[in-house]
Amino acid sequence: YKDNPTAKRIAYRTEFNQEPKEMQPSNVVVDSIIADLKRAEILLTNIDPLNFEFPKTEDGNGGTGKDGFLEYRHKRMNLYAVKAMLARVYLYAGNKTEAVNYANQVIDGKYFDLIGDATDVLRSKEIVFSVYVDKFDQQVTDITNGTSYLIVKESFLNEMFDVANDGTNDLRIREGVGFDYGTNGIKMRKYKQENLWASTEGTVVLIRLSEMYYILAECAATPGEAAEFLNKVRNIRGVDPVVCTEANRLDEIEKEYRKEFY
């Protein structure tokens, strides 16, 4: 997009039919995505019930006795998921002003919190948008039982989480939280369905609150300001503060994306 915004890349559908659709230039696709999201924002404002809670126990109607469809809004396309996606696409398009605007709206909405609770494996209060996958536990079991799911070399994991600089206190790399460490290798716990609350089972996270801080870091006016946004997440994850310079800022942001979303 940045290097050649008028080059034709993908088709973008605005109608539900089987008719062939011509490839569209990148800038047209981005404009279309923004237009769709802005329309969704208008439609959801003052309509979305904004119920964002994963109870530890639940009844058949989402844990509150209310209509289950109106609960667990982070399992559906909700108003703040739309705002978060606008922050994403505006950053991609190079419009940092609007990227900051929408990232801050998600953070300042006070519906989500960064949490460091190791017992909440999915960090449910951070989930802005996710999807529910039926019988996901069976699919995960089939995948994780084989050796192909193993990380054989611990050195790879250490590089991924920058252990040489950050140590092993990071919540995301700890035994029983982020990974299981065994004699045959290391297994990622990202999709494992063990020890989850009933309300979080089958949940695949698509947008986390932490991403909004990373967007703000990339848009920050100075390296010091960028470091402040990164450190808000690092502090919750149990990692010491990082210092950013003009030379390393993007590298440090990339490292945090990698650790958070691996």
Where do the language-model regions lie?
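Acidic/polar-rich alpha-helix caps and helix-coil junctions
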Residues: 1-147, 164-262
